[in-house]
Amino acid sequence: MARAIEQIERDIVALEETVQAIATELHSAYTIYLTALGQAVRQQLILASYHLCTQGYPKGFLSLPFSQRQQLQQDIRKLGQNAAAQLLAHIKTEEKDESQEPEDRSIRTEVRIFNSLSAPAALASNPMDLAQWQQNLEQAIASTLKMAARETNRLLQQAGILPSKLPPPVLEVALEASEASGEAVAGSPPNLLNLVIETENHQESGESSVTHIIAIKLRLSEIEFADATVRAGRNQIRNLEVKARSLLREYLKKQQEREVAEAEAAWRASWFDE
């Protein structure tokens, strides 16, 4: 029985070594993927803003003085750059120092929230740790895209392009609610949503008004579909995920075998014939 337990322990150690190798590969794959994703996010954010300003709300954009148009474009580029920096920071936080943090305060906050993301991948000793690390990282990616779109919509609203009568919180809630059912604007690039928002009219009790709005909504699936490099990076991650899931099943099986063997040994050790 002792030999059986020792063999199971050796099997578990071998699995943990394999997990560490997969974790290293996954960390490297995410570094490549997030670098490409950051570039794609910058491009898609600018493209979505361009179509929103020129096709969705051309009058609002034309009403801006030339200097304000330039400033708006610069601010949009900066938001894209900050989002790209944050995406890579999720996987490389151990290489960043305080002076390299993005300037945007909300981005600095999110970088700190996910400041421990990189460590578990390198130190993962079992498939559960690796799966948790990846789940946290995917949540961080989704949060970054959401924040970039939110800040861009807010910028466009402050510039008078998006309807100003909708408070930013109302717009954000509408975007959240329409995430599953919202439709992309026909004939436009991805990452735009066509929204119809009903608001109460306080001047005339009992009546409400309907506001049509086009807003930016960055979708990871659409960004990956539009960029071959990002899509290839995601495919590599999926291949490693398959290996990690297989290791997880085997690891849990070995853990159960060890528990059974230890319980059997404990029973025999405490049993005595009367």
Residue ranges and their predicted role:
Residues 23-26, 30, 34-37, 41-44, ...:
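Coiled-coil heptad-register positions
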Residues 3, 10, 42, 69, ...:
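Arginine residue identity/basic-tract feature
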Residues 1-35:
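N-terminal alpha-helical "arm" segments
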Residues 2, 9, 24, 120, ...:
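A near-ubiquitous, low-amplitude feature marking generic local secondary-structure context
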Residues 189-274:
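Alpha-helical oligomerization segments
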Residues 7, 14, 18-21, 136, ...:
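Charged, amphipathic alpha-helical oligomerization/scaffolding segments
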Residues 32, 36, 40-200:
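Eukaryotic long, low-complexity intrinsically disordered regulatory regions enriched in serine/proline
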